[in-house]
Amino acid sequence: MAVRTAERVSREVSDNFVFQRSRLAYVEAAGRIAGRVLEIGTGTGYGVDIIAPHAEHFTTIDKTRSDELPPMPANVEFCEAKVPSLPFEDDTFDYVVSFQVIEHIKQDRAFVAEVLRVLRKGGKFIVSTPNRPMSLTRNPWHVREYTAEELGALLSGFIHVERLGVEGNERVWEYYEKNRASVHRIMRFDVLRMQWWLPRWLLQLPYDVMNRLNRRRLHRSNRVLTEAIEMDDYRLVEVHDRCFDLFYVATK
C-alpha cells in the first residue's frame, strides 16, 4: 500500500471529506481577491485554477514543487521558497492567501509579520486552518492548532479581522461521526496517551499509515456517503466552536 503523507491535502477519494472542505476556501477567496495575489502553500496546486482567473498576477509559493502541480496559466508564477521569510519587497501584494498551512509553521508570529510586510496598505490576508476543538486526534504534521480566539490573537496586528468558520450539513456530520467512532476504536490502544507527548517526528509515519488505513476503510464501508460529499455541503458562517475550519480575513 502506498502511503500518502498527511502533510498536504489529497485528492484521493477516501479524503473527499477534507478535500471538498479545502476547495471551499479557494472558492470563497476567489470572490474576494483582485490585483496582485500571493498564495503561501501551493501544495498539489488544486487551487491555482480557482484563484488565477480573478487575479491580475498570481504568485504561488511552496517549499518544494509537487509532482502533481498542473500547468500554470499565463498570469501565474510558481516560486520555490521556505517561510517564514518571504522573498518579496515590502508592499508588493493586494492579497495574500494561505490555506491549511499556518498550523505547520514553527515561527507563526514571524510568518504573520512577513505577510503584513509584503501586503500593501488596505491589503487582505485570507487564512484557513483547522479548528482545534474539532480535531479527533493529534496530527503530528501540525506544530500547533488554533482555537478561534488564538487565531484572532495571532492576527491582532491587522486593523480588522473578519472571523468566519466552515461548517457542514447533515451529510458532513454523518461522515464526521463515523470517522470519530473509527478513530476512537484505534486510539483506545494508546493507553499511555503517547500521541500527546512523543516527539512529532516519531509519530508522523505511524500517523500517516493509520490515517490512510482508517480513511480507506471508511470509504469501503461507507462508499456512497464518502463519495457523495460535495463542496456545497460546506458553508461559511460566523465562527463558532463546532466549525471544522477557521477562515479569517485580516485587513492591513
Roles of regions detected by a PLM:
Residues 135-153:
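Acceptor-substrate binding/catalytic loop of class I
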Residues 123-129:
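Conserved beta-strand signature within the Rossmann-like core of class I S-adenosyl-L-methionine
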